[in-house]
Regions:
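Membrane-anchoring hydrophobic segments
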Residues: 1-164, 199-203, 217, 312-313, ...
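Cytoplasmic juxtamembrane regions at transmembrane-helix boundaries
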Residues: 76-91, 164, 169-184, 271-284
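Hydrophobic alpha-helical segments of polytopic membrane proteins
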Residues: 80, 157-230, 320
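Small-residue-enriched transmembrane helix-hairpin modules in multi-pass membrane proteins
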Residues: 127-132, 213-322
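Hydrophobic alpha-helical segments involved in membrane association or supramolecular assembly
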Residues: 148-152, 180-181, 188, 192-196, ...
Length: 381
């Protein structure tokens, strides 16, 4: 049966998916709390703070809808029937100048990642020592170039050969041993294609399953490569354990609000260039050890600025995501590409937290795109 998710105006990647994924993250953690008893169960405050954060995220979405409708006459619930897929191109069709530039940028990102792995002298996925050294300046530049370029390329040009570039980049970034980069590549590309192609449900399901497999495989292999850690959990149990542990760290962040007083956000923005890790500060502030750990999307803001800072952060994320979502429903191209990137990275933040300077850079670009569109906007979508 050829059923398409877009029929009936069902929007799979609406910003509200962040709420759904956060609840799913909680559910994944529960076996380790209530059945395996591997970790201490959280108190009520954890659920309260998560609920408040998600509520303000929804407030941001609602405000975006109001502003776009009232001030810019933009229909924020655009019918998917108005969506047009990019024109199909064969391998031998003429390449425009812009397409060649994008292919060149994607290829440059791939080349830089190959150079990065070659300079490391091995594959970081299979070596904890190499993985600790893999996030070099070359790696950062390659990721900043590759992720936006491949998504814009997929959004603008419907040429099957571009999927090969996507696959090559995905494999190379997976070999660094980090889960977040290959997941961001796969998820952002899926979101971009969802809004620019007529995607059959079976391919969406296959893509989601592939993302889950990559998440399990990269995470499990990377953990097994750490010689000083010994795990008896299988890959699925390990995911549940990590979710429960991360949420327990959030509980500690709730208890230790204002501990870092803005230093965590400052380190996030500058740490890559000063060789300091914001997640180590999270470890020091929550468990009292010099250890790099994650604290969910809510934790860092709580440690820096307390509950008010966390609520403002969630409100702004909801506002930005929904505004870009509404704009990309109309204009596609680069707007869809960056919506895919920001939504994918925000979903990843549900576990890791906003402690990556590159994601804040993408958010800054997203804000500039919104301003650029709205300055010339008086549209009726």
């Amino acid at each position: 049966m050829n059923y398409n998710f877009k029929n009936g105006n069902f929007d799979l990647f609406h910003p509200l998916i962040v709420v759904v994924m956060t609840i799913l993250f909680l559910i994944i953690a529960m076996p380790m709390w209530y059945f395996y008893r591997e970790l201490p169960t959280p108190n009520l405050d954890l659920y309260l703070y998560i609920g408040l954060g998600l509520l303000f995220f929804i407030f941001g979405i609602c405000l975006s809808n109001c502003i776009l409708k009232k001030n810019f006459k933009i229909d924020t619930v655009l019918s998917f029937k108005k969506i047009l897929s990019a024109e199909k191109l064969s391998l031998f069709d003429n390449y425009s100048k812009n397409e060649l530039i994008l292919v060149g940028l994607v290829s440059l990102g791939i080349l830089l990642q190959i150079i990065n792995i070659a300079l490391l002298g091995g594959i970081p996925l299979f070596s904890a020592t190499l993985k600790a050294k893999a996030a070099t300046k070359i790696w950062l530049i390659s990721y900043i170039i590759f992720l936006p370029s491949i998504n814009v390329l997929l959004a603008k040009y419907n040429r099957k050969s571009h999927y090969l570039l996507l696959l090559i980049g995905l494999v190379l970034f997976a070999l660094t041993g980090y889960r977040t980069t290959p997941i961001a590549i796969m998820l952002s590309a899926l979101i971009t294609l969802y809004y620019t192609r007529d995607v059959d449900v079976k391919y969406i399901i296959l893509a989601i399953l592939a993302i889950a497999v990559v998440l399990l495989a990269v995470g499990f292999i990377a953990v097994q490569a750490i010689s000083w850690q010994h795990w008896s959990l299988n890959p699925i149990e390990l995911v549940s354990y990590r979710a429960a542990f991360t949420l327990n760290v959030l509980s500690k962040a709730i208890e230790n609000q204002f501990t870092t007083m803005g230093n965590l956000f400052y380190t996030t923005l500058t740490g890559f260039f000063t060789h300091s890790d914001a997640r180590v500060l999270v470890g020091q502030a929550t468990i009292g050890r010099v250890h790099s750990i994650t604290s969910t999307i809510f934790g860092p803001a709580l440690l820096d600025f307390g509950i008010v800072g966390m609520l403002i952060q969630m409100f702004l994320i909801g506002l930005i995501l929904k505004t870009l979502h509404s704009i990309q429903n109309h204009s596609k191209s680069i707007f869809t590409a960056f919506y895919g990137i920001l939504l994918a990275q925000t979903i990843i933040w549900i576990e890791t937290g906003p402690t990556d300077v590159v994601v804040w850079l993408f958010y800054l670009i997203g804000i500039f795109l919104i301003i650029h569109f709205l300055r010339g906007a008086n549209h009726e979508i």
